[in-house]
Structure formats: structure tokens, C-alpha cells
């Protein structure tokens, strides 16, 4: 009798942990990394430059609003001219089947390096991204953004950029 109770208890413990482990696996898919490359300020022939960037999104912190589902993002980009932009902000994601439309807004800090003088250290990035689901955890996309200091500085030339994105959920 004791052996039967022990085996039943042991089975329940292992069954409970295995069910919980599956829940944790599903819940762990809430972190998204976006690696992208493209052309910084493609519309200015004198100052355009190749860029490389990385962005992190944590969907555990998302919120449903009247604008849709919003989640925080943080990232950085560097250009071949040693300019850099470090940012944090918010993005929304709208799904149309396998196609995703993702607008975002991120204030950040811009460091000129040998690149374009944007007029101020504080810059605001507005971005539109379109991506296609490759699998449940991967997307391939294209995005366009504009950096501007919103006239905080004496000059506000702005910069238009395009990027090719690879997004992966973990």
C-alpha cells in the first residue's frame, strides 16, 4: 500500500512539473531580437552610409490600448562613418495573415562620429516596418525610418534610412 501511494505521488509530481515545463516553454517565446542592416540617410548623397543595428522587444511588457497592442523596444545602430544612435521607445504590431505591419516611435541619443550632423544629441526615430512570417519564430522584413530632433537644435536636417530586418523570437 505504501509503495502504491509513493508511486502515485511520484507520478503526480513528475506530471505536474512536465506540464509546468511546457507552459514555461510557450511563455519563453516573448523576447524578440531584430538584427538589421541598410543605408543611413540614403536621400543625402554626401552623407549616406551603411548601417548595422540590433533591437530587443520584450512582449511580457506589452499593453492593449486603443492604438492596438503596444510593446517596449530598445536598440542601437552604428554607421560605417562611426555615428551611433541608442534608443528606447514603443512599437505596435498588426498582423494580416503572414504579413506584419509594425510602426514604432523611439526617442534616443545620437552620436555624430564622422557621420552627418543632425543638429542635436536628442533625436526621435519614426519607423514603419513590413515583415513576412518565415516560421512561428522568424520573420524577414523591410523598414523605413526618419530621424529628427524636432527642432530642438539650431538645425534639423533629419535623416531617412532603409533597412532589411531579420527578426527571431526566443
Residue ranges, per PLM feature:
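Cleavable N-terminal export/targeting peptides
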Residues: 1-28
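Short loop/turn motifs that connect adjacent beta-strands in outer-membrane beta-barrel proteins
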Residues: 21-30, 44-45, 60-70, 95-101, ...
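Mid-chain, well-packed structural core segment of small domains
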Residues: 99-127
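Helix-adjacent hinge/juxtasegments
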Residues: 81-105
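Residue-level signature of outer-membrane beta-barrel architecture
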Residues: 56-58, 92-94, 132, 146, ...
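Transmembrane beta-strand segments that form the barrel wall of outer-membrane beta-barrel proteins
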Residues: 32-41, 67-79, 102-109, 143-148
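Outer-membrane beta-barrel "beta-signal"
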Residues: 48-54, 132, 157-170
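Solvent-exposed loop/turn segments connecting transmembrane beta-strands
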Residues: 40-50, 76-87, 114-121, 151-159
Amino acid at each position: 500500500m505504501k509503495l502504491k501511494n509513493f508511486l502515485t505521488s511520484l507520478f503526480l509530481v513528475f506530471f505536474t512539473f512536465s506540464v509546468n515545463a511546457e507552459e514555461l516553454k510557450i511563455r519563453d517565446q516573448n523576447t524578440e531580437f531584430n538584427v538589421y542592416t541598410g543605408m543611413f540617410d540614403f536621400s543625402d548623397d554626401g552623407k549616406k552610409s551603411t548601417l548595422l543595428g540590433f533591437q530587443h522587444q520584450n512582449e511580457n511588457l506589452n499593453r492593449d490600448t486603443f492604438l492596438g497592442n503596444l510593446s517596449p523596444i530598445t536598440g542601437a545602430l552604428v554607421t560605417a562613418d562611426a555615428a551611433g544612435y541608442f534608443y528606447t521607445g514603443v512599437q505596435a504590431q498588426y498582423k494580416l495573415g503572414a504579413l506584419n505591419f509594425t510602426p514604432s516611435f523611439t526617442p534616443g541619443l545620437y552620436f555624430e562620429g564622422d557621420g552627418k550632423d543632425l543638429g542635436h544629441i536628442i533625436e526621435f526615430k519614426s519607423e514603419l516596418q513590413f515583415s513576412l512570417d518565415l516560421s512561428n519564430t522568424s520573420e524577414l522584413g523591410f523598414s523605413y525610418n526618419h530621424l529628427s530632433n524636432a527642432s530642438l537644435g539650431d538645425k534639423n536636417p533629419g535623416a531617412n534610412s532603409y533597412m532589411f530586418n531579420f527578426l527571431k523570437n526566443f
